[in-house]
Regions:
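PLP-dependent amino-acid enzyme catalytic core
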Residues: 1-187
Length: 187
């Protein structure tokens, strides 16, 4: 199956890629990011620019320079250490680097990415409740929204990374009511 992965530092997505590399039954990896979308821009356009991170409801994903992205670039470059070092030395010095067309194509062959807005995140929390009677957190909603956007007919699993009770204000606003919180969450 394919996987939609909520992505901040790109660790879970890279772990999925590595699992596939060693023979795991892992299909395509689709990185789902919030409006802090430097990773998605790098994969989709080849232009990797560090911006100031902005706070979102999916706060663990508020990252503009994902630490694990360098690992994927290294692998996509054919494990070319000097080339990868050059890309990230340039990025670290300037906050801006343009990836070559070959590298960009190699990256997209490994991972695709979508940017999900705060409105889409809220709408997806409501959709998950209305359609499946599930209350999901903002991080999970970003992954579900990206999976729904992918819509290529292949089964896709959206990773869920937190409990919705950790985000009561945003989830309540999205649903229009305060969901029940399991007793175990309060302990």
């Amino acid at each position: 199956p394919e996987f939609g992965v909520p992505t901040g530092n790109f660790g879970d997505a890279f772990a999925g890629w590595a699992g596939r590399k060693i023979g795991g039954n892992i299909g395509h990896i689709h990185a789902a990011v919030n409006r802090n979308d430097a990773l998605a821009q790098a994969i989709n356009t080849g232009h990797y620019v560090r911006h100031q991170a902005t706070e979102t409801a999916s706060v663990s994903m508020d990252v503009q320079a994902p630490s694990n992205f360098e690992r994927l670039v290294f692998e996509a470059s054919g494990r070319h250490a000097e080339g990868t070092k050059g890309v990230f030395d340039n990025f670290n010095a300037t906050g801006n680097v343009h990836l070559s067309g070959d590298l960009q194509n190699a990256l997209r062959a490994q991972v695709t990415a979508s940017t999900i807005s705060e409105d889409e995140t809220a709408q997806t929390i409501k959709y998950a409740h209305d359609k499946w009677n599930k209350v999901i957190c903002p991080h999970t909603a970003v992954a579900v929204a990206a999976a729904l956007k992918r819509n290529d007919g292949q089964p896709i699993i959206a990773l869920s990374t937190a409990h919705a009770a950790k985000f009561p204000e945003f989830v309540t606003k999205a649903l229009g009511f305060a969901p029940d919180v399991p007793e175990a969450i309060w302990k």
